């Protein structure tokens, strides 16, 4: 593994690169071609073209891209504070080892964030003020994948073990990041996962076309080679919690925000209504177990599908349903459509509040001829047919109104706007309401009003001695990059608790 070393403060290799080269994203397969499989569909650019993209980093005075600033209620810039200008320049200078070293200094799993992160960094890129931002996420992915392909990434086995044992409960991005950092410090780490495969959200919450599971398993194998243990199929109840707290020097709970938000409407008990997390997991598991041929999954084939929720998970469900062979798909969004371009009160470097058409929606447009999204609309009633099977959904339009009790703006139904849609499969992708109650109860922990484990900003220690928490379980539903950041921060706190100091950053 290359050493990050010290980098002398110098001018960027090509200060005029942003004026000479235009932005070029990784390639994208046409929608009607890529829906034929669950494979990833973004071939990478050539090395020569990638070097040009690295050269576009402009040696700006203040690299907002790595700042993670909260502006107007949203974060802009990288939560991991990646050394973005440095490794962009190393790409241009043809220094793959140094680029990799600088990237790995702050990022645990660039192969994940380089695929699924919404690129908060690019929203804050100085080039984006007047032109197109640098392809930071694609550059990140190039560095890490080039590192794997060239054999630059090898197991980093600690030379000395501390004699301390740490149990990490949950193997999603926060759990893996925490385990990786603690193992690096020489602690003996075991990760406990309730599912049949490690990876958590990365394995079963993100479809293969966005994150091939070979990529997840490659990282798990690397961590195993470095000394991290994994125990799957392990549900933590009261007895298991007692065992972990008695046998380990520290326990870190990284179980995510696992309680999905439900629909409270008439007919909710109809057969054919599923949460998005269960739908996506069943597809991925069936693909891994038998190539989706065994029929042991929630199928959208030949069905009229309605997806409740306009976020990334809802879009993932659209793309997955299309690959199943659904007859039609509609995606309901409660909020109004965002503008196509930035408004005057949403300037750079704020996160751009604009309408984004993601891959699943692109595929629906190409296949069915129209955007699947219906804005300012929600479900009012579910109708069952023979055998209690879902047969139709009644929707209603919404409008913004002031709640007199709270003074807040809420979405209220517009009388007389009801519509009936044929529907054989309803998928609820409305987000999550908090941490798993069963795990919290097992450790004697109470959730706060938001359903999360209470912990102050920058503090991952719970009210139970030697039990810590990180990721969505602590901060609520969020992004993979935030989960990784949380895991790294929690690892430093646990290390300090165990050793009296820490050199983890």
Tell me the role of every PLM-derived stretch.
Residues 166-168, 189, 305, 467:
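Conserved hydrophobic helix-helix packing surfaces used for dimerization/oligomerization
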Residues 142-160, 218-238, 260-324, 448-463:
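Glycine-rich dinucleotide-binding loop and its adjacent helix/turn
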Residues 269-302, 401-477:
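FAD-site-proximal beta/loop scaffold in flavoenzymes
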Residues 170-173, 309-311, 472:
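Glycine-rich Rossmann-fold phosphate-binding loop(s) that bind the pyrophosphate
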Residues 19-25, 31-43, 55, 79-91, ...:
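Beta1-alpha1 glycine-rich phosphate/pyrophosphate-binding loop at the start
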Residues 314-317, 324, 473-504:
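A conserved FAD-binding loop/helix module that cradles the flavin
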Residues 98, 160, 165-169, 217-265, ...:
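Feature captures the FAD/FMN-dependent oxidoreductase FAD-binding
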Residues 51-55, 59-67, 73-158, 224, ...:
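Glycine/serine-rich phosphate-binding loop and adjoining beta1-alpha1 elements at the start
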